[in-house]
Amino acid sequence: MYRNDRTVAILLAVYNGEKYLAEQIDSLLAQTFRNWTLYIRDDGSVDATPQIIGRYCREYPGRIIAVEDADGNLGCRDNFFRLLETVDSPYYMFCDGDDVWLPEKVGASFGEIRRQEERYPGIPILVQTDKTVCDERLNVIAPSEWRAAGRNPDLFVSLKYIPILCVGGATAIFNRALRERMFPLPADAPMHDRWLSLQAARYGRIFSVHRPLILYRQHGRNAAGAAMARYTFPWRKIKRLPSILRRDYGTARYYQRLGYGCFLKYFVARALFIVKMQYSKRTYGKSR
């Protein structure tokens, strides 16, 4: 177990990330809030990623720490989970190796989670931020992912049950109380950021900072992509309603196995999501 002597543990899971990794680490080193430690686990890269990590660990001992084990390639999800179960810290942030964090990201996120902990002491809390979507050269595609999609996240966290991915892991900060709710993992756990979202919705609270604080780089090797398309009700899918219901039935069974309640709860949440998205796409950003 790695015990973080600072306030925030930034967990960076990387695989074959030589192209962008140094730029991301440099953006972390440029943060205005300094009370953090970076923990990096390489997932068996075959490029120059291990050498890049080694160089930064030597240049910033105690600030940047390589988490090493003999388990080799775990995959994106389990690489993040391994970091989370290995590091003990008051607060955590997931970090992708191909993004760029704006200088105020850690400070703004930490300030907001502390404000919410004062309002709601002792419970799991997650704070997410907006992000700017860029191409691989950091040319801006969408200044705000949320507004490009017409998706106000505050409308959905009130559901207390999230049948969609609500929080991008790289935008989040969360406290130890939420980390403790993420283990033990079910055998068929979803991706790390979806599991984070689900546990926060189930046991705690989710809050949003309506500022883009990372440059999210879109390129051909992303493990996950930005959801920017504006939601419209899928009228053309009415003919496919039976197959859609079969798919949702399988999804509802999956969430039921994870302990998120009955089928009715899932389908009510889906219906509320559709209604709220129709409202959100017409209003979000107009009053801000």
Model-derived features: where do they sit?
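Nucleotide-sugar donor-binding/catalytic module of glycosyltransferases
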Residues: M1-M228
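Terminal low-complexity segments of carbohydrate-biosynthetic enzymes
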Residues: A229-R288
